[in-house]
Amino acid sequence: MQKVHRHGDKRSCGATTEAQGYSNVFVNNQPISVDRDPNSHGGGALNAQCRNVFVGNKLVVVVPNDSDADALCPIPGHCNPKSDSGSPDVYIGQ
């Protein structure tokens, strides 16, 4: 089972996720992260790899999921700033 990724959770590059795709579903009082949510460095859209859980017709992001490069690429770590942290007690099985 994998942790659910949320707004403000860390990315592997040190940025945080900016949950923008859906704002009415919360996990531990934080908006849930869904496919294509960017990070605080600009860009870095997440590529949700959860196959079975959707929010507003978008796949939910879990830890770790890959992402597009953010605005600081080609600096190491910024060309795939994966989801790196998540809820301490909400998990999704694949």
Task: Give the ranges of each region predicted by the language model.
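Intrinsically disordered, low-complexity proline/glycine-rich segments
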Residues: 2-94
